Amino acid sequence: NPTTVMNTQGPIRWGKFKIRDYHDYGAKLPVWEVITKSSNIGTARIAQMIGAEEQQKFLTNLGMTDPIKFEMIEASGGKPLLPKKWSELSAMTISYGHGLSATPMHLAVGYAAIANGGLRIQPSLLKGGSGAEPVRVMSTASAANSVKMLRGVVTDGTASMGEVAGYAVAGKTGTADKP
């Protein structure tokens, strides 16, 4: 639910690791602001609520854990780099852009599923498509809420430079530092 309020007080300490935000957003933010402002602490707390197993299942259904089937052999072999053990810490770091590396094709398929009302469609260069049936990976309500939040990232958040007159652009930035 986009209005659920998350604890964004931090940093989150997990053993020798610290999860921080780029800016201090205060002690609490609703989920829609966690996404709009790109709060690492907020997304990590959401991942804790969901749990590592459910997150892994969702990302697998979204097509983010296996190579994407595609007509071009050069584009179809890319396999995301996944954690060896999908732990609670892995789930938290994956939530804000660490812990999982995906190809541009994976990102396109994932974002397209959100834009398509929660239906994952196999990408294709063929005019008639791949012939594969779309797969429901999230409810239409969840997809609509996700589109609204991603649109908010562009209109009110960290991706304001992505706004294009005449288009309803949605997007997501990353504020996590990668060494």
Protein language model features and the residues they cover:
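Beta-lactam-recognizing serine transpeptidase/beta-lactamase-like catalytic domain environment
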Residues: 1-179
